[in-house]
Amino acid sequence: MFILTETAAGYAIFKAKDKLLKKRDALIEDLKSPEGASNLLKLQSFAKFESTVDALDNVSALVEGKVSSKLSSLLEGLSDSKSSTLVVADPKLGNAINKLPGLEFEIISDSSVQDLYRGIREHLSSLISGLAPSDLNAMSLGLSHSLSRHKLKFSPDKVDTMIVQAIALLDDLDKELNTYAMRVREWYGWHFPEMGKIIQDNLAYARVIKAMGMRTKCSETDFSDILPEEIEATLKSAAEISMGTEITEEDLDNIVMLADQVLELASYRAQLSEYLRNRMQAIAPNLTALVGELVGARLIAHAGSLMNLAKQPASTIQILGAEKALFRALKTKHSTPKYGLIYHASLVGQANSKNKGKIARVLATKAALSLRVDALSDKDTTNGNIGLENRIRVENRLRSLEGGKLLPLPTAPVQQSKVQINGTSAYSTATDAVTKDAEESQEDVEMDIVIEKKKKKSSKLKEADGESSKKEKKEKKDKKHKKSKRKSEESEDGESPKKKKKSKKSKD
């Protein structure tokens, strides 16, 4: 019986008696000491890993239940031995070894081998000569770090984390930026209240504060890089007749520091928005082309990952983000919401209030198709052609609802076939002189068949008409016969039926 053991240093195969696993209680007692383990198990062969990269490749294959080339070559060396039993710790690995050609082993990988492997791992340094416990611990630690790094690097869900965190931070920055900008306006408004109505843009407001300082310096300051000429002239004239209070230099320093914070946050927000756009274009290009990077990122963040969102049906994508309204409507038995986060897409915004629900439903359907291409396609889809085509289809649907002109669909490039077949694959009838006559005769036969069918049909109709006419004539004759019989009876009595009725009434 051979026992396959995977270590951080390499593959080890131990040889033991076949009856070892049957005496489980005795096995546990014997494996308590290194001497007992050495008496039971003998090292048959040991394949050492050449480097850390080699160890990582082999251990990654073991985790997936695959047989590496090093392990396969090691097992081939056991094919000449008389023993046909191989003990393996992982059942998946045992099934993979069974499928290898040329190896005929009876694989044992049930719960009975757990005590055996527990004893081997405990006395591994004594069973393998030249392997110190400190070296084995260092190898195990390094290999575990490499394996964890490898799993994190190739995890498909970790890529979506960047989008989820970026869109969450972008929303937080918008709130902070709006709060700081309003605080600057309120604070500096005590000194120059007219400036808030003249300058509407928050960033321009903060830049003017940094450039001007006190409002008394407004006439001396050049705002050509910040404001247009008309607004600059209005601002300077308003500064001369302002009704604001006076502030100290210390107050102004704090206001300027807050204005610096607003400008820094705005700069970082623009950088983060560009990062999110590039990341969405790389991960979900078709969804980005259809609904935009912000709406697409919010949909992915709400679902948790791109794969989770791709598994959702179109009806769920349509109302994603409106769960509270949906459950409230179901509870109160009112109409359910027509859209959720997808409402903020530009295509839904272009539609009027009557058609927003229809466009949201169509857009959710196309978004579901684009998502599945982005998440599951093996081909390179970074160009986003499917998303652009779906966007044109949704726009055409919107134009058809609102009576606009339809847009032409993009034509996909025609791919030439890899194999071009020249020549004829069957007999060519074009070179046959008899073909034309045969075709004409065939056409004549078909025409004759059609004419005969028409004749039969017309004859059946005539027969049916004849029978119906005979019935009508017979009914008319019967009616005439009844009338004549009734008249003859009346003439014999000498009174009409009306007179008979009157006479009966008079007698009564």
UniProtKB/Swiss-Prot annotation:
The keyword rRNA processing applies. GO terms for biological process: snoRNA guided rRNA 2'-O-methylation. GO terms for molecular function: snoRNA binding. Residues 440-449 have a biased composition (Acidic residues). It is found in: Nucleus, Nucleolus. The keyword Nucleus applies. One of its GO terms (cellular component) is box C/D methylation guide snoRNP complex. It holds the Pfam family NOP5NT. Keywords: Nucleus, Phosphoprotein, Ribonucleoprotein, Ribosome biogenesis, rRNA processing. Residues 283-403 form the Nop domain. It comes from the Eukaryota. Its main location: nucleus. PANTHER family: NUCLEOLAR PROTEIN 5 NUCLEOLAR PROTEIN NOP5 NOP58 (PTHR10894), NUCLEOLAR PROTEIN 58 (PTHR10894:SF1). Required for pre-18S rRNA processing. May bind microtubules. This is Nucleolar protein 58. The lineage of its organism: Eukaryota, Fungi, Dikarya, Ascomycota, Taphrinomycotina.
